Regions:
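Short beta-strand segments at enzyme active-site cores
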Residues: 33-34, 64-69, 100-107, 140-144, ...
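Small/polar loops that bind or transfer phosphate-bearing groups
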Residues: 9, 140-144, 215
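A short acidic, helix-capping loop that chelates divalent metal ions and anchors anionic groups
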Residues: 38-43, 72-78, 111-115, 175-177, ...
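Short, contiguous strand/loop micro-motifs
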Residues: 6-8, 39-41, 77-79, 115-117, ...
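N-terminal pre-domain/capping segments
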Residues: 1-92, 96, 100, 255, ...
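Active-site acidic/histidine proton-transfer and metal-coordination neighborhood
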Residues: 18-19, 56-59, 75-166, 175, ...
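Active-site-proximal loop/turn and secondary-structure-junction residues that shape catalytic pockets
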Residues: 12-14, 36-38, 70-73, 107-111, ...
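Histidine-acidic metal/acid-base catalytic patches
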Residues: 1-7, 14-30, 58, 99, ...
Length: 261
């Protein structure tokens, strides 16, 4: 089974930065995920601020597994696209300075057909961001879930000279009725990080719903075994998308669940 390296999504803890770091460390995590613009305003960090933040994180024996940069729209949305691309590049550059190997974003709804006009425009953006990642040293990771794994893989493979990673989100795949194993098979070694989430299909409601990690249909022992076959060495990120009354307990339970696999 692949080695379980756990990161905590700091935003889910709903605490100031230093307290969040202390709690993540107390849970037994080895890394964190920061939210650009929420946990820390990257654009306002000076060189001194970057050094201080890196030291603060290291003081808790943690590292940054990824930075989440959630744009209002994906790269499939033409309005304001140039600004989103430039902002993504800026975050990737600052992420490298902070020691983060990945910047995660939901890139938009990828068409299943490669001859779709939207596929072609998204492929051009992904190529641009992939080449930028090679230059700056931190890569964009496209989160799974809004399309099938094979559809996302076709987009990421459109330019063999530009690398964009994948952030596997099993819960979102379940909720949107896509196969997890299909996604792992299609994306392979591009999977650099896992958003440790879970879900079930609510047949009565005709839709999928999010549930706490370990309480849904995501088969994490099998997921980790499949990832091990593809030399996965990344982190599994635990934590709710938005902090709530139960988020701290859910994060702690999630860490314990993964450590007990």
């Amino acid at each position: 089974m692949a080695q379980v390296r756990i990161a905590v999504r700091l935003q889910s803890l709903g605490l100031p930065l230093r307290q969040s770091l202390a709690m993540a460390a107390s849970m037994g995590a080895s890394a964190i995920q920061l939210e650009a613009g929420k946990d820390v305003r990257l654009s306002e960090l000076s060189a001194t601020g970057i050094r201080q933040l890196r030291k603060m994180i290291a003081d808790f024996d943690l590292r940054i597994a990824s930075i989440r940069f959630q744009t209002r729209h994906g790269y499939d949305h033409a309005d304001g696209l140039s600004r989103r691309i430039d902002a993504t590049k800026d975050v990737m550059r600052l992420a490298f300075q902070l020691g983060s190997p990945l910047v995660i974003n939901q890139i938009g709804n990828v068409p299943e057909q490669t001859d779709h006009p939207r596929f072609e425009s998204m492929a051009a953006v992904i190529s641009d961001l992939g080449r930028h990642g090679t230059r700056v040293g931190t890569f964009l990771a496209a989160e799974t879930g809004t399309e099938s794994g094979p559809a996302l893989a076709r987009l990421l493979e459109a330019d063999e000279n530009a690398f964009v990673a994948a952030a596997l989100n099993p819960g979102k795949l379940i909720v949107n009725r896509f196969g997890i194993s299909d996604a792992i098979s299609a994306l392979g070694s591009r999977i650099q990080i896992v958003i440790a989430s879970d879900g079930v299909l609510d047949l009565a409601a005709g839709r999928g719903i999010d549930v706490p990690l370990g309480q849904g249909t995501a088969d994490y022992p099998n997921i980790l075994a499949e990832l091990e076959n593809r030399q996965f060495k990344g982190h599994l990120v635990v934590g709710d998308e938005q902090p709530g009354p139960e988020s701290q307990a859910r994060a702690r339970d999630g860490v314990e669940y993964l450590r007990n696999l």
